[in-house]
Design a protein with these regions (language model features):
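Flexible loop/turn connectors
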Residues: 246, 256-332
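Periplasmic-binding protein-like
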Residues: 89-90, 138-147, 205-210, 246-254, ...
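Amphipathic helical "hinge" segments at domain boundaries
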Residues: 40, 64, 75-133, 139
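N-terminal helix-turn-helix
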Residues: 32-69
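An alpha-beta-alpha
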Residues: 190-229, 320-332
Length: 332
């Protein structure tokens, strides 16, 4: 029995019939791991097809992780698991409690409908570039966290444009891709505006912004808010003892700095929420109880993952801002 048999009366397109033929051969064990497939030219000539039709079929099988190609040698069987229609490439910056929420939300939507491979670039531009280059052409969809890395659009340009989705952070170079992202400048300004009445009890507002991982939009929203209401403010890159004084309020994106500010305040007998104020970024259950509650600005990470999962499965491409809110607690 031939691997591929084209039925002119079939309701399936010819390239899909090629795909189904390979799937049948895998399920019937007529093809095994690392077996060589017939060449594109051979399949085309034997079935009266164009090379483009066969290439389209083989490309889909590659994206689903069923076959792989070696330049100059041909196509070979990579996997016998053909039950998933989609093989997804998911690139995160790092794994922390917030990103785990995104991942769990994404999995909740995807369930068993697709095969998923997850990678991490750890904010390293070279690792990002390498992972993108090595994945090109091997997956049906690419869900990518570019974070604040420079020139990510150059690496992403190697991927099929119609298969790319951007997650969490986007930028002007990536604005043409569908995304579920945070609007950092808008969220910062809106959050501070909502607690403006509390800020009148303090003298100066600080944003602790190291600039390594944090989005620049945080700075933009912070500075715009402070300029509009003429509130004394400063963007600092690290915490010094002399910053922690009565009347200071700190916006803290990084939890390491949150611990540092609290420790310095305790050493100097400063009460959180009375002598100094704290607004932390990204809510977790622990922040409900630390120092009787830490005020937070946070997006819904789990919902972000679910929204992206729905978008990938539905094929409905949009650019969506994930909602953010400020949770007022005793630290302000």
């Amino acid at each position: 029995m031939p691997l591929i048999k084209i039925d002119p009366a079939s309701t399936h397109t010819k390239y899909k019939q090629v795909v189904h033929g390979i799937e049948r051969a895998l399920s019937e064990k007529r093809l095994r791991l690392n077996d060589k497939l017939p060449s594109i030219n051979k399949v085309a000539l034997a079935n009266g097809l164009s090379r483009d039709t066969v290439l389209q079929a083989y490309d889909e099988l590659k994206k689903r992780g069923l076959i792989y190609s070696i330049l100059g040698k041909g196509y070979f069987v990579k996997s016998l698991g053909f039950h998933h229609e989609q093989h997804l490439f998911l690139l995160f910056d790092e794994l922390n409690s917030f990103k785990e929420m995104i991942y769990n939300g994404f999995l909740e939507e995807i369930k068993e409908k697709a095969e998923l491979d997850i990678y991490f670039h750890h904010f390293n531009p070279q690792v990002f570039q390498k992972l993108i280059s090595e994945s090109a052409g091997k997956y049906s969809k690419y869900i990518i966290m570019p974070s604040n890395l420079p020139r990510t659009h150059e690496s992403i340009a190697k991927l099929p444009k119609e298969d790319v989705f951007i997650l969490d952070q986007t930028n002007a170079y990536l604005s043409h891709f569908p995304s579920v992202h945070q609007a950092f400048a808008k969220d910062m300004k809106r959050g501070l505006t909502e607690v403006q009445s509390r800020l009148k009890f303090y003298r100066k507002l600080y944003l602790i912004y190291p600039g390594n991982k944090e989005p620049i939009g945080m700075v933009e929203g912070f500075q715009e808010f402070c300029a509009e209401i003429k509130f004394p403010s400063e963007v600092i890159h690290s915490v010094e003892e002399n910053h922690i004084q009565k009347g200071a309020v700190f916006v803290i994106p990084n939890d390491d700095h949150l611990v540092e500010v609290i420790e310095i305040a305790k050493r100097n007998n400063l009460e959180i929420g009375k002598h100094i104020g704290i607004i932390s970024y990204n809510d977790i259950p622990l922040k409900k109880v630390i120092e009787n509650g830490i005020t937070t600005i946070s997006t819904d990470f789990y919902q972000m993952g679910k929204t992206m999962g729905r978008m990938v499965l539905s094929g409905k491409k949009q650019r969506l801002e994930n909602p953010s809110r400020i949770v007022l607690r005793q630290s302000l």
